[in-house]
Amino acid sequence: MRTYRKFTKDQRSTFPYWFWHWLAFNDVARELHVWRPHHILHDIEKPFLRLVFPYKKVQKWHRLHNRHHLEYRYPERRSWLDMIIDWEASGRTKYACPRNAIEEARFKLNEGSMSPSDYTQFYIVWKELADRHPQLEKHSV
C-alpha cells in the first residue's frame, strides 16, 4: 500500500491535496476491485474552479453536482459505491477524517445529515463490498 501525505483542513483547497486525494480514491477503488474509467476524473473540476472561486464556494458547488456526496441535487442518482470509496480515501489524506466509510455513515446518521433510508441504501452497498473485502471492516483499506 502506498504511503499518503495527510493534510489539515486549511490545506484542503490546494492542488497537492486534490492530487493526493485523487491518488487515494483511485487506489481504494483498485484495491476493492471496483475501479471504473470515470474514476480518473474524480473531483477533476476542483483545482480549476479553485483558481477562480473561494474554497467554500467550490466545495458547495462540488457537493451539489457530484454523485458521491450526500448533498447531490438528485438524491435518487447518488453513487453509494463512489461515496464509500471517497470516504475510505479521505481517511488516508485528511487528518480531520479518522473514520472509515461505515463509521462515517453511522456518524452522519447519528448527527442527522443522513436519513435512515439513505443509510439503508448505503449499508446494502457497503455490506456487499465488506463481504468480499473484510479489510473494509478493519479500517485498513
Task: Label the model's feature ranges.
Residues 1-141:
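Metal-dependent phosphohydrolase cores
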